[in-house]
């Protein structure tokens, strides 16, 4: 009998050995930045998936409380650094709502144009690295070639490829040249062909489908429970897009469709992103057509924006205004506001509390990736280890905005 109990102990010891913990990341190529997951595996099946975040935490929200509204703008480029201008947009909208500034029409169109370029930048990176995570080599090379062209458009508008600081409260920093508008138009004509090539390579690819179909399925209840937004919602069959449901800027004038999925799995989210790039290209083309007709200023001239260069050379008041604007900054009336934009990753929101001074009292940043990553344990449970990287890929996480 004593022998038997010993034998049982050995058996339970054997069973104890079956669940083992491994670290996924932070330097894993599929970890998309500095994600660290502690995975508990039963054989190859994921029992628990524990995300450890904070490796890129810079205290953005706290830093913002000690700087002027304009000095805070560049912090937004450094959140989701894959598509920087979309974040600046939310910050500018929040300030404009509190101060009651009307943005000139041309500036509004330029904002929409560059927000959509940002969406294409983001989805190109996501779709192609998603393919790379499951073993394809060609798509990332093609995707980065196209992103390079768009980065050049960023650079020609603002002088920077990545951290543009181009959107300003009251408009955009400077006007686009006619030549740039022509070049973007030329790119937009050729881009659908690139998407067709990507489509041909991935959409019906047997291996790509096996790795993505029925992986990470999300239901309507999950969406409401976890607070998903963006492609995570649309992939499950709900046409929820802030550009259509709560139009901001001048999105209500544009003709575009909202792609939705059916099963809510990784594959449907991939298809949504592919189609969204096509729709963004349509919006870009409509924008360019409108920009050719709409002339005018790109900044609402007043207390929020600097005076024109020429004026500063002749007017003392303009010079003083310029100096005060960049040292002390403008004052925003006391109040609170929530401004949200449909960023490429989902609903990016800024909850701004102003106390009437030249600095925000408190700014809360709602990063879509944060809410998506929360659910990784729930989504990945019961999947295989290899599926975890496919799931992370379609959650579309970037750590600038998650850790902020």
Swiss-Prot record:
Keywords: Cell inner membrane, Cell membrane, Membrane, NAD, Quinone, Translocase, Transport, Ubiquinone. The keyword NAD applies. It is a peripheral membrane protein. It is an enzyme of class 7 (translocase). Its main location: membrane. One of its GO terms (cellular component) is plasma membrane. It is found in: Cell inner membrane. One of its GO terms (molecular function) is quinone binding. Its EC number is 7.1.1.-. Gene3D superfamilies: Cytochrome-c3 Hydrogenase, chain B. InterPro entries: NADH_Q_OxRdtase_suD, NADH_UbQ_OxRdtase_49kDa_CS, NDH1_su_D/H, NiFe-Hase_large. Pfam families: Complex1_49kDa. It catalyses: a quinone + NADH + 5 H(+)(in) = a quinol + NAD(+) + 4 H(+)(out). Belongs to the complex I 49 kDa subunit family. PANTHER family: NADH DEHYDROGENASE [UBIQUINONE] IRON-SULFUR PROTEIN 2, MITOCHONDRIAL, NADH-UBIQUINONE OXIDOREDUCTASE 49 KDA SUBUNIT. NDH-1 is composed of 14 different subunits. Subunits NuoB, C, D, E, F, and G constitute the peripheral sector of the complex. This is NADH-quinone oxidoreductase subunit D. It comes from Cereibacter sphaeroides (strain ATCC 17023 / DSM 158 / JCM 6121 / CCUG 31486 / LMG 2827 / NBRC 12203 / NCIMB 8253 / ATH 2.4.1.).
